[in-house]
Amino acid sequence: MSRIWSMMDVGRRSLANSQTALQTTAHNVANKSTEGYSRQRVDMVTAQPIGEGKLRIGMGARASQITRTNNQYLEKQLEREGTHLGYATARSEMLGRIEQVYNEQVNKGLNHSLGNLFNAFRELSNNPESLATRTQVKESADYLAKDFNRVHHQLTEIQNDADYRIATKVEEINQMTREIAKLNEKVQVVELTGVPSNDERDRRDLLLKQLGEKISIKWAEGSDGQVTVTAGGTGVLVSGYSQRDLLVASAPGREGKREGNFEVFYKATENSTPVNITKQIKGGEIGGLLQVRDNVVNEFIHGMDQLAYKLSEEINQAHVVGYDRNGRTGNFFYETPKSVEGAAEHLKVSDTVMNDVGRIAAAAQENAPGDNRLANVLSGLQYKGVFKGGTATLDDHYNSLVGKVGIEAQRANSDMQSQGDIVGQLKNLRESISGVSIDEEMTKMIEFQKSFDASARLVRTADEMMETVLNLKRM
């Protein structure tokens, strides 16, 4: 009788094992498209056999635990490479926008406006007494000044957009770290019972990878299953159940940053002073946005300021000593910039010239009708070396900016594509290890179904044997 009971117990346990395996298969299939999900499997172990004399009678199998098929080294590698991809993607997008500012085909370009001004000065040298030609000079100069203003405005708008995106990313980071802290608690509570917290760990791993795409982080898992996450080298965002938000605040203008740029701060406690960790953020989307905003865009703004300042300085120095149509001198052509910084933003034709084109000087001598020597000097400024120790013209300086942004944008796009390929390969590798194959799961389902049927037949057989034994007792 005891052996029949044992056989029935083996069958019953086998039925339960098959049901568990089938349910796990169903869970895998249902999560085929769930991002970050790791395929799960039921680990079966041989049940403790029983001894009967010299015999060791097997007691079937039992489900020891449900584990996930996961490679933690690969997950960490994906997080690291994702950080590089986030950085490269942000830089590529931002540099693409800067490139559009200097796109000669779309905007005709500042180079075109610069050429028009010097062409107008040449026309003035051919007709030094003409008011119509002077009007053309004024309009060309005004259009050029507005082109400088436009480029400066578009570059600062790119910085403003970077600020907005940084603030948005920081809020997303805070939401993620809050969830990671909650998952830490769930993982610990579940695993205190000795049961692997598979789904919670999958979700936490996914959040860590997504977090790494936005900001460079370091994380480590403790023996209790909880992860500690730091950002910016010192800011502990998650430690066990606790979480600290990152903050965004406007900073005063300093060290090349314009006033009002957003910077990232960290508070260790509610009552502590916020610590600026902006300079420590070197990776992820925020790192890429900061690098372009604070370095690349500022470099191009400074380059445009240098060009606007030198243009106005050279033209004013020549124009102020010349004589206008009525023999007057001492007129500035452009409003004199206070300094190089902000010259492109504030460049404008002087009110004197805007109100009276007759005040545009063309002559080098007083009361000399037909004198075009000053107009020739003004038109010749196009070819005068005024940068790099007198070896580069205004055109050369501008073209160097255009060439540089093109090279930078191309390099950033290449970096993004290369990094995207690396991440893509790692994701494919992860999919081959941890991903769900529908064909494979269907094969397993059929196998477990057959096992279930066989187990049910075993239970029925044991039941029939028990019935036979009971009937013998009744006879």
Model-derived segments and spans:
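S/T-rich, low-complexity, solvent-exposed segments of bacterial secretion/appendage proteins
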Residues: M1-M475
